[in-house]
Amino acid sequence: MFKRLRRLRSSENLRAMLRETRLNIDDFIAPLFVIESDSCIKNEISSMPGVYQMSMEPLLKECEELVGLGVKAVLLFGIPKHKDATGSHALNKDHIVAKAAKEIKKRFKDLIVIADLCFCEYTDHGHCGILENASVSNDKTLEILNLQGLILAESGVDILAPSNMMDGNVLSLRKTLDNAGYTHTPIMSYSTKFASSYYGPFRDVANSAPSFGDRKSYQMDYANQKEALLESLEDEKQGADILMVKPALAYLDIVKEIRDHTLLPLALYNVSGEYAMLKLAQKHNLINYESVLLETMTCFKRAGADMIISYHAKEVANLLQRN
């Protein structure tokens, strides 16, 4: 006797009723890039078609469209006019992301604004903090990250997302926020972030490529599974409210491993290189793009992700509304 498993696949309605993993637009976070400019700017990135550097008005228009589609959250990255060795623009109370957060919350009070907390977009060397002897100083970087986090919390950001991969960054930030009265501001930590070649196109849009070396001394080795789990569990211990794995496609084993060891919400970042690959395949008619897109996003959830940060968020929202 054998089990006839095909019985439960015999019709579309039966398959739909028994589907274990379902996509919902509430799962998605849309990353947005705001550029400091006195002009109206909306620059499409050649390596990421459909992704733009936007000044304030186009950014607000994009938020309006996302809200109309049911997207509940955006993740902001800033592109300043001025960069220097210490990323001092990020410590200005009127810096580009702080201003954008204020404007978004004025117009769309229910839209969740998440701010990336790092210095690579603000430093002239493209590394994620203060340099000492051509290396990023962990503890000095924590000091300025805390200041940046406080400015963003004061500007009305709903969630802070430290992406710097400095040791102790979650505990240090949590203490700073709590001492300033921001006890209800959650931290979504980039808890397991790999030193990955999949980030290539992001550095085009954020103008954040390192001017020398790489980030392997602070971002994780992609060969390591146990260390990946340790990083996220350590951030949970330090007080992270949400954990994250970045990148996504080649790291679903890591997502599953962390999911099995934590009860915290788990985000996954579907990064620029992954986005660009699907877009290139679409351009050359190599795949059924919409089917592959929905399959990919469903597999992210099946692996254990509760939230999906993706440049495809708007496309997925449109597809889910149609279907």
Curated annotation (Swiss-Prot):
Quaternary data: Homooctamer.
Reaction(s) catalysed by this chain's protein: 2 5-aminolevulinate = porphobilinogen + 2 H2O + H(+)
Disulfide bond residue pairs: none
Keyword Transcription assigned: no
Example GO biological process: protoporphyrinogen IX biosynthetic process
Binding annotation for 5-aminolevulinate 2: S272, Y311
Active site per database record: K193 (schiff-base intermediate with substrate), K246 (schiff-base intermediate with substrate)
EC assignment: 4.2.1.24
UniProt keyword list: Heme biosynthesis, Lyase, Magnesium, Metal-binding, Porphyrin biosynthesis, Zinc
One MF term in the entry's GO annotations: zinc ion binding
Pfam families per the UniProt record, alphabetical: ALAD (PF00490)
Binding site for Zn(2+): C118, C120, C128
Protein name: Delta-aminolevulinic acid dehydratase
Associated pathway: Porphyrin-containing compound metabolism; protoporphyrin-IX biosynthesis; coproporphyrinogen-III from 5-aminolevulinate: step 1/4
Family affiliation: Belongs to the ALAD family.
Cofactor note: Binds 1 zinc ion per monomer.
